[in-house]
Structures are given as C-alpha cells and as structure tokens.
A protein has these predicted regions:
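A short hydrophobic beta-strand segment most commonly corresponding to one strand
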Residues: 44-45, 95-97, 110-116
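Glycine- and acidic-residue-biased ligand/ion/polar-headgroup-sensing regions
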Residues: 58-59, 64-84
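Residue-level recognition of conserved beta-strand positions in structured domain cores
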Residues: 46, 82-84, 108
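Short acidic-glycine-tyrosine-enriched beta hairpin
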Residues: 84-101
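Double-stranded beta-helix
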Residues: 1-14, 107-116
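A short glycine-rich, His/Asp/Glu-containing loop-to-beta-strand
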Residues: 17-61, 67
Length: 116
C-alpha cells in the first residue's frame, strides 16, 4: 500500500526554464515536474538540440543509474548504439524503453532533435 500523499504538478511550456547540464553540452533541458510529483521516485525531462552536430560531439558511452528509462523522440532523429540492440537511428515518434544500466552511446543527432 502506498504511503504517498496525492500530489499533482502541472508543467507548462510557457514560462519554463531551460537549463544546460550534464553529459550533453549540445542539449538544453526542461524539467517536467515528475520528481516533484512522485517524491523523487520518477524523473523526466525534455531535451532539445541547441547547437549543430559536430563529429565526435555526441554523448560518449555511459549508463543511467535507474531501474527504468524511456526515450521518446518528439522531433528530428538521433543515431545511437545500445548494448544488446546495436546501432540504430531513432526518428520522430520512435521510443526506446529499457530497465537497468545498459551501456549506450549517442553518436549523431539532427539540428531539430527534441527528446523526452
């Protein structure tokens, strides 16, 4: 039985702060309020490209310290490689979902790339 108190968070695009952080200097991020709504159990951001791709400018091999991860391409595309999946190009409307810490590398992206 859950001990969480009911909470609702509305994240509007207008007035949202976009921040630059983390492993990907080519993206800026918008926090969707999921961590606030779930007392830190779930997180979620939107990332969008802020500069043109340059060779070698993707995200090097890494893992995410999480039990579940979802990548949904909202706009554009990116070329990526996941252990167990291989190298793929993921396009607008495509989704990758996985559990655990799967090694991955993000190789290339479009100028209009936007991802949740």
């Amino acid at each position: 039985m859950s001990t969480l108190k009911p909470k609702i968070v509305l994240s509007r695009l207008d007035g949202t702060d976009w921040t630059r952080k983390g492993l990907r200097p080519f993206l800026e991020y918008r926090d969707l309020g999921l961590a606030e709504a779930t007392e830190g159990r779930v997180g979620g951001t939107i990332g969008r490209a802020i500069k043109k791709f340059e060779p070698g400018g993707g995200a090097p091999r890494h893992t995410h310290n999480t039990s579940f991860h979802l990548i949904f391409v909202m706009r554009g595309w990116f070329r990526t490689e996941f252990e167990g999946l291989g190298e793929v190009t993921v396009r607008q409307g495509d989704c990758i979902a996985y559990q655990g810490q799967i090694p991955q590398e993000h190789i290339e992206y479009s100028d209009d790339f936007e991802v949740m």
